[in-house]
Amino acid sequence: MAMVERPRPEWASYHNCNSNSCQDLGNSVLLLLGLIICINISINIVTLLWSRFRGVLYQVFHDTICEKEAPKSSLLRKQTQPPKKQSSPAVHLRCTMDPVMMTVSPPPAHRHRRRGSPTRCAHCPVAWAPDTDDEKPHQYPAICSYHWDVPEDWEGFQHTQGTWVPWSQDAPESPPQTIRFQPTVEERPLKTGIWSELGLRAYVYPVNPPPPSPEAPSHKNGGEGAVPEAEAAQYQPVPAPTLGPAVIPEFSRHRSSGRIVYDARDMRRRLRELTREVEALSGCYPLASGSSTAEETSKNWVYRSLTGR
């Protein structure tokens, strides 16, 4: 027969001690975790409340401080503010473009730009207003108005202003010089120029002398039918007046600070006078007709350059 062993009381007490110690350890761990969570939540709440409270305090104290310092700052500004200087008025220039009378003025003195070579500028396109009428001025002149700082030597422009005077035979000859034009496009100076050498003059020399006039009296016989010298002089043809070449005035090669007035009508009149002189001289000598006209013309006209003189 099997014998069943009865539990002893010592074993029950040992089992109760082990279970109680385990429960106490678990409770202590849970309590520690809860305490950590509560501390974290409290820190977050305090931080949020402090940020809000600090913003409210900043607004309150800032408004009160600004209200107190506003009158003081205004007084200091009034005391330290210097008197306003009178600003220089803007200079308005008004120029008129006319095909008959054109005023050419140099660019402002404060702009320094390199000038192109004469050979290069000779082929540059230039905006030029055509002359529609020789006698009547343009009815609708183009008027331009722009702001431009007056250079310091602007007063010197009026003193050095010059005008082309009508040509006369007794006028002294001027040395060969250069003229330069600088038009503007869209209120900006267009950097193009014309360099024209005007040192060429044309002289006409007759190669073949004119044939003797048949109306001239014969002085071979000095007898009774002789005509007095006074009457012979009346029958001689009046020679054409010898006119000198048209001297075209020129300008200095150096840049001038003055304004030069160019009279297109006067220039056209001089060209017409020169044409009449050439026609008068060419009419005194008969030229052969036919295909040899061009050859005779080239023989009877001799052109010489006086630029080297």
UniProtKB/Swiss-Prot annotation:
One of its GO terms (cellular component) is membrane. GO terms for biological process: flagellated sperm motility; sperm individualization. Its main location: membrane. Required for proper cytoplasm removal during spermatogenesis. It is found in: Membrane; Cytoplasm. InterPro entries: SPEM1_N. It is a single-pass membrane protein. It comes from Homo sapiens. This is Spermatid maturation protein 1. The keyword Zinc does not apply. Disulfide bonds: none annotated. Keywords: Coiled coil, Cytoplasm, Developmental protein, Differentiation, Membrane, Spermatogenesis, Transmembrane, Transmembrane helix. The keyword Membrane applies. Residues 259-285 form a coiled coil. It comes from the Eukaryota. Residues 209-231 are annotated as: Disordered. The chain crosses the membrane at residues 29-49.
